[in-house]
Amino acid sequence: PLLAIETIEKLTKKIKSVLPLGCKYNADMVTNGYKLTRRVAEKLKDMDIHYIQVTLDGSKQAHDSRRILHNHQPTFEHILDNIRECADILNISIRINVDKTNINEATEIFDWLERYGLKGRVGYYLAPVDDINGVCNNHICMERPQYAKEEIAFIKEGIKRALCTKVLSRAIMVYVEQLA
């Protein structure tokens, strides 16, 4: 959506102009984060878009092999630079897309969060790659029980490193503590 920031601005103004008196507007956005500069983050905040979900496809290696620019340049570190620059302006969560081929590297995100000074500044969580429209190769999609086991291990590692996510519920925290 950030390729069309002017359209977002126009739509936001239009929506706000027709709101009934006393109604407030706010919005969330999902983006790959590549165009999420500080200037863009300030514009989004001014438009009452305060929460941004940035998607990464697993570890740096997995992400950069899947999400490259047309000139074959990697994007992972550029996206983390952008998140670092914007984390004090917007509420940002990183969704880490995982499947059988990259799940074993998922905890590498913790090293990157620490390296980029993002510990405690952003949320993060795993999301399984699902075969919702027949596009995913079924051999790489995880079954729910396998994903659940991997997600619990991921959460436990985050807790161990004191990188508890902003989006962890208290119920999950208690459950994970009981498993430890």
Language-model features and meaning:
Residues 2-51, 55-62, 69-78, 96-108:
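Canonical radical SAM enzyme core domain
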Residues 65-84, 88-179:
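Radical SAM enzyme [4Fe-4S]-AdoMet core and its adjacent flexible, acidic
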